[in-house]
Amino acid sequence: AILHTEPDWQAFAQECRERLEAFTGDTERQMDVLREQHHAQLFRLLAQDLDGVLSVERLADHLSALADVLISVTLEAVWQTLSGRHRDQPQFAVIAYGKLGGKELGYASDLDVIFLYDDEDPEAPAIYAKLAQRFITWMTSHTPAGILFDIDIALRPDGASGLLVSSLAAFEKYQHQSAWLWEHQALTRARFCAGDHNIGAHFEALRIQVLRQTRDPAQLRSEILGMRQRMHEAHPNRSEFFDLKHDAGGMIDIEFIVQFLVLRHAAEYPAMTGDIGNIALLKLAGDLELIDSQLSVAVSD
């Protein structure tokens, strides 16, 4: 019966905290506890999935909620291991992008995240960089219980050449003055997922502000099409089978269409900034008559 009950993520988070606390000071055991908890919940969701009681959307919601909880409790546990911490609670947040950001996580998805802080302490940049580094280690290390998640931090400001953590002020300046269009596209599927809720609220306000900028439609279309073409050329399909993700008419094409619709119309239709997933955004675009409503339903299906 437990296998087939709806997950209670709040109770699960509390259970994780209690089990982690029981092994305070034993980092390796704490890391295994997180992995064991993850595996148990994955098994439950897989059982429900195989029984056909979960829609694709509902399963993705649960997998994303599971990741959110594990990110949150891991962040809390890691903070307690830092000898240089200067406050009880870090003024630090994890922002989710990509599949986690859009609550479209699959069983084997990696996590696209960036790290933001809002702290005037002169030691803050160094402390939060150490927090982020240790958080990544806890998530990605191979232990006897496996790994928790693969982490991708390529979407941080300035990419591979950028700092691991960004102050909220620097991130805001970057988005307004330096970010490429593809970085604004990425914001269509970004959300706060763990840490300081005040930073989360500031991030969401900034995200909406950026997405609602007035843009030249022709230039926007040209840039997005050019970017999509470069991606297509980087993933040639040499097989005789259709590549559901990369081929023309595949998932990435649909994602780019949704991102274009958001960046093109959010200034006039604020509802288009909602982080509600590609399917819901397509249906919303149809309801708002931005695209043919029958087409939006067909593509969503």
What kind of region is each of these model predictions?
Residues 1-301:
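A nucleotide- and high-energy phosphate-metabolite-utilizing enzyme signature
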